[in-house]
């Protein structure tokens, strides 16, 4: 293992430890496919422990000593993620109040983290352009109950070299503990407008519209 990979693996270990301390469940992912390397459904209700994480990094997972991480979203970890997989999706999220200060820089966009409200509420996963209760924007997805998101310091590898590292981009005036102040309440309350394009009266063509005259309505 090269020195670069050793440093990255230590950073990933530290990231996993931080997640567990936050009460967030993480699982190992394949570097090549983003697919989980374990049967992970049980961890939607069961705690991922420090001991389990240490075993992954010590012994590997399914013969893999190099792997990425994902955080399980939803009530189990107390978080949800607005997943912007394109710059178009990022711009839409920024215009429509779907962002938070807790940002992960991904390969093509950003992940915005919010606090899951708990109290028995459920927020299912959403895919941009599918369904009526989520904006029809390609690349704008939602990771909620039953989902997961690639977690820092996961990497994208091409030709055996690291092309990108998933990293936190949080303003200096915040830390992850402040996420409790950014509770997700659902798209209806969160977004300014549910449609892809903002409506403007200035865009209407009124050229052939006549002004109202009361005399026109007289018999």
Where do the protein language model's features map onto the residues?
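Signature for HUH/AEP ssDNA processing cores
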Residues: 1-108, 117, 191-193, 197-218
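DNA replication initiation modules
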Residues: 73-90, 94-95, 115-219
């Amino acid at each position: 293992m090269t020195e670069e990979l050793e440093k990255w693996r230590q950073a990933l270990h530290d990231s996993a430890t931080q997640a567990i301390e936050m009460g967030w469940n993480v699982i190992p992912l394949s570097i090549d496919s983003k697919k989980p390397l374990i049967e992970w459904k049980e961890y939607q209700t069961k705690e991922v422990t420090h001991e389990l994480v240490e075993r992954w990094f010590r012994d590997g997972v399914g013969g893999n000593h190099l792997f990425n991480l994902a955080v399980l979203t939803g009530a189990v970890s107390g978080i949800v993620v607005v997943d912007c997989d394109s710059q178009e999706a990022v711009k839409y999220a920024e215009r429509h109040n779907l962002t938070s200060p807790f940002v992960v820089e991904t390969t093509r966009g950003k992940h915005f983290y919010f606090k899951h409200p708990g109290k028995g509420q459920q927020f299912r996963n959403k895919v941009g352009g599918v369904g009526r209760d989520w904006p029809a924007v390609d690349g704008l997805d939602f990771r909620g109950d039953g989902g997961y998101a690639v977690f820092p310091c996961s990497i994208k590898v091409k030709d055996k070299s690291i092309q990108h590292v998933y990293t936190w981009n949080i303003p200096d005036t915040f830390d992850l503990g402040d996420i409790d102040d950014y509770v997700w309440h659902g798209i209806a309350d969160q977004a300014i407008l549910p449609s892809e394009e903002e409506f403007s009266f200035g865009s209407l063509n009124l050229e052939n519209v006549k002004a109202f005259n009361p005399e026109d309505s007289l018999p």
